[in-house]
Amino acid sequence: MSKRNQVSYVRPAEPAFLSRFKERVGYREGPTVETKKIQPQLPDEDGNESDKEDEQPQVVVLKKGDLTAEEVMKIKAEIKAAKADEEPPPADGRIMYRKPVKRSSDEKCSGLTASSKKKKTNEDDVNKQSPVRKNSQKQIKNSSLLSFGSEDENE
């Protein structure tokens, strides 16, 4: 058993005539066991290999309102500039959490409807200011409720 662990392969030197022949032909050796494990380096571009000129989609303008090729290039440049403005991730690799940016009241009400405790309390305040409307709402709600002893009272 111990002899089996001591066995190793020693690659002999390549003969001179083979090395000259391979050089003349332009032969490249395939990957070895050591080189297969190495990961290839990826280009530092934003990972958008489709940005190459021959791989871009063809722009066809059918109507006056369609985007032209120049407008598309401007939009792409704006997107790249916006990405450049963002802060790069920290060097130590830690994720930093920040408070979200507060929105103005106009943005909050732009078509979104969500119920929250504040809105409910605001509605209650409005209802307290107009008790007449509140009483009429209670009467409507009471008429829709089921009650078994109310027939004698109503008649």
From Swiss-Prot:
Keywords from the UniProt entry: Acetylation, Phosphoprotein
Domain of life: Eukaryota
Pfam families: DUF4604 (PF15377)
The UniProt record lists the keyword Acetylation: yes
Bias-annotated ranges (Acidic residues): 43-56
Residues annotated with Phosphoserine modification: S50, S130, S147, S150
N6-acetyllysine: residues bearing it: K108
Biased composition (Polar residues): 128-147
Chain positions covered by the region annotation Disordered: 24-63, 80-155
The keyword Phosphoprotein is annotated on this UniProt entry: yes
Protein name: Uncharacterized protein KIAA1143 homolog
UniProt organism field: Rattus norvegicus
Lineage: Eukaryota, Metazoa, Chordata, Craniata, Vertebrata
